Amino acid sequence: LFEGMHRENSYHGDAERFGIASAILLGDLALVWADRALVESGITQSEFIHCQTIFCEMRDELMAGQYLDVLEGALGTSSVERSRKVARYKSGKYSIERPLLFGASLAGAERLNQTYSSFGLPLGEAFQLRDDVLGIFGDPSVTGKPAGDDLREGKRTVLAAMAMEHTDAAGKALLDRSLGNPDLSEKDVAALQEIIISSGALEQVEKLITELTTSAISALRDPQLDGKIAKVLEEMAIIATQRSV
């Protein structure tokens, strides 16, 4: 957006550098707005103190996850465990676990923190794994993104890491030189999809999603948790992991 604005208006200097700098500043501004929204939310000072701690931890974890994601791409290597760590920090914690803990704090229900963590962490990871599958095998007419977008972007996902581990030498070489190539054709993407399927990686990831979802739902059996809340959270878990978009 900012880079395009620079080019369209013939601004001085480098358009790409302007775009990157402007995007970073916009991200900084969004963090300021998030703080302001919390301060102006109407919660009490005591509630604010408790929530602010969770809020800061959530942002720390998110930034760490984003950095690890960038680092994986720069290293150009694949590791299932490292990719899973990225999934946990980049998505699992901030998208599900921390918001639940945030709500528990506001409701004075910190006694449920362990239950919410036991539910949120595996579900958050499963949510990211489903996103990874859709990023390679998703239907463009449903997702709104070209098939194989994650391959073109060179994302070192758990799915890609598992494929690298279990495919043969030729498949590994093709994956290695193809990941991050923005010019991959539909035919190229189809060839990479076949490698991922034949290596067993897709089946393994689907199995892992099921295991993580089952683990998350089992945490909802806590007798301290209201049955209606447990039902809503279970439905959310199914929607989050069985989605097609």
Predicted regions, residues:
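All-alpha prenyltransferase/terpene-synthase fold signal
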Residues: 1-245
